[in-house]
């Protein structure tokens, strides 16, 4: 099991960031450039949850089907139910709080590998994960700072 934690501050307000996390429309892959549009599929969206499949081309392609839950104010969590690499129960969690006019974003990523490829990825994440995830998140925040308002919880 690999756990990566990091935090960063941004000028993007909490509601705007959470709306981007919970936007399951066709624009999602453009908001989150690390997502492969070919792997993105929305299965169901409710008032505070969404079941989706997402993936990236990293390491020959890793996909995950799981549930986003934003029922707790200021928290968005994606829990893996099925993946070609990681065990059910692996997760991403974003805790977002106001920081001046922007946000403090605290991220926890827990990966439980179930394949040899995933074990290698988990090893790499234990060394480079914080930097990689932070850089990916910073790209999204830069996009959000320059775009119009986004509606979350949509498909």
Map each language-model feature to its residues.
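Hydrophobic ligand-binding cavity/cleft-lining segments
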Residues: 1-47
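Short, surface-exposed coil-to-beta transition loops
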Residues: 3-5, 52, 61-65, 87-92
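Beta-strand elements of well-folded, non-transmembrane domains
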Residues: 10-12, 56-60, 72-74, 84-86, ...
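Hydrophobic pocket/interface hotspot
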Residues: 17-21, 28, 78, 105-107, ...
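Glycine-rich portal/gate segments that line the openings of hydrophobic small-molecule binding cavities
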Residues: 29, 38-83, 139-143, 147-155
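Beta-strand/loop substructures that line and gate deep hydrophobic ligand-binding cavities in soluble
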Residues: 79-135
């Amino acid at each position: 099991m690999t756990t990566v934690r990091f935090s960063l501050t941004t000028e993007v307000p909490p509601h705007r960031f959470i709306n981007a996390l919970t936007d399951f429309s066709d624009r999602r892959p453009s908001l989150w450039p690390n997502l492969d549009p070919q792997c993105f599929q929305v299965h169901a969206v409710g008032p505070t949850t969404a079941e989706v499949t997402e993936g990236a081309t990293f390491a020959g392609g890793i996909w995950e089907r799981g549930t986003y839950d934003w029922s707790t104010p200021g928290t968005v969590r994606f829990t893996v139910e099925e993946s070609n690499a990681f065990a059910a129960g692996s997760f991403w969690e974003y805790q977002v709080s106001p920081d001046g006019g922007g946000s403090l974003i605290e991220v926890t990523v827990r990966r439980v590998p179930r394949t040899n490829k995933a074990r290698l990825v988990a090893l790499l994440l234990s060394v480079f994960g914080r930097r990689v995830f932070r850089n990916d998140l910073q790209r999204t925040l830069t996009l959000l700072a320059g775009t119009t308002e986004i509606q979350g919880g949509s498909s």
